[in-house]
């Protein structure tokens, strides 16, 4: 039997977890940090830089997925899957992501649907309005 002191000591020695868990993130902070160091974007990379970068990547990914799901649900009654087309439509319709990714070409995304005003069909006016009175 463990004494109460030993039990309290064991409970306080919980495993601390990784940096992602400490920061409350899903994206791997360690992997992002190693990729930052390997890419040689700067001579030195601080510990908080990897956490911040992972948080930004996680936020942008969540935002992109949320908008893509909305775009897919607007296209079909029951959205079954996200395609590059729905991601492209979501990015181009959102103001902030559109500005951020304005020079990015998404593979298999297609183009934004737009119709030139000159090519749009003109509605015919009613027959009564077109008829001229005979004199």
Swiss-Prot record:
Its main location: nucleus. One of its GO terms (molecular function) is protein heterodimerization activity. Pfam families: Histone (PF00125), Histone_H2A_C (PF16211). GO terms for cellular component: nucleosome; nucleus. It is found in: Nucleus; Chromosome. The keyword Ribonucleoprotein does not apply. InterPro entries: Histone-fold (IPR009072), Histone_H2A (IPR002119), Histone_H2A/H2B/H3 (IPR007125), Histone_H2A_C (IPR032454), Histone_H2A_CS (IPR032458). Keywords: Chromosome, DNA-binding, Nucleosome core, Nucleus. The keyword Nucleus applies. Belongs to the histone H2A family. Core component of nucleosome. Nucleosomes wrap and compact DNA into chromatin, limiting DNA accessibility to the cellular machineries which require DNA as a template. Histones thereby play a central role in transcription regulation, DNA repair, DNA replication and chromosomal stability. DNA accessibility is regulated via a complex set of post-translational modifications of histones, also called histone code, and nucleosome remodeling. The nucleosome is a histone octamer containing two molecules each of H2A, H2B, H3 and H4 assembled in one H3-H4 heterotetramer and two H2A-H2B heterodimers. The octamer wraps approximately 147 bp of DNA. PANTHER family: HISTONE H2A. This is Histone H2A. It comes from Trypanosoma cruzi.
